[in-house]
């Protein structure tokens, strides 16, 4: 790892650093962006469903601010078509990190007649209205999303 070199009475240690991988560079950029947004915006939010993309986003946010807590809240637009295990994992991850989670429900919009089921059964396109209304009503001024 390092080699001690004697120069007069001082000892210097030379350390060889491994070159950064492409993944290291991407991670560093993501951490920088999280910190920059925290400094420039009043109320950022991370979209968080408990899926793989949002888990990576939360991991990067935690890395950006460790050992302090992540200074953002989380928002999930629940389609109503999620596996119960994913929602359970989502809730456990949020609790483990000590964060607050807001949930906007597509089903609630359908139940109150503001949205209508699609003939093909997919609800992904229906997430737009609950998402934009949650962003506006909760006054988020920056939004992080994965995938």
Feature-to-residue mapping (PLM):
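ATP-dependent adenylation/nucleotidyltransferase module used to activate substrates
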Residues: 2-147
């Amino acid at each position: 790892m390092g080699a001690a070199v004697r120069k007069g009475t001082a000892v210097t240690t030379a350390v060889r650093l491994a070159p950064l991988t492409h993944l290291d560079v991407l991670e560093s950029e993501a951490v920088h962006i999280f910190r920059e947004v925290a400094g420039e915006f009043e109320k950022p939010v991370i979209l968080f469903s408990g899926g793989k993309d949002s888990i990576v986003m939360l991991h990067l946010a935690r890395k950006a601010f460790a050992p302090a807590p992540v200074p953002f809240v989380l928002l999930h637009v629940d389609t109503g078509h999620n596996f119960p295990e994913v929602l359970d994992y989502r809730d456990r991850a949020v609790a483990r990190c000590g964060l607050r989670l807001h949930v906007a429900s597509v089903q609630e919009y359908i139940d109150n007649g503001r949205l209508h089921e699609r003939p093909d059964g997919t609800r992904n396109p229906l997430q737009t209205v609950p998402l934009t209304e949650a962003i506006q009503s909760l006054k988020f001024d920056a939004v992080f999303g994965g995938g």
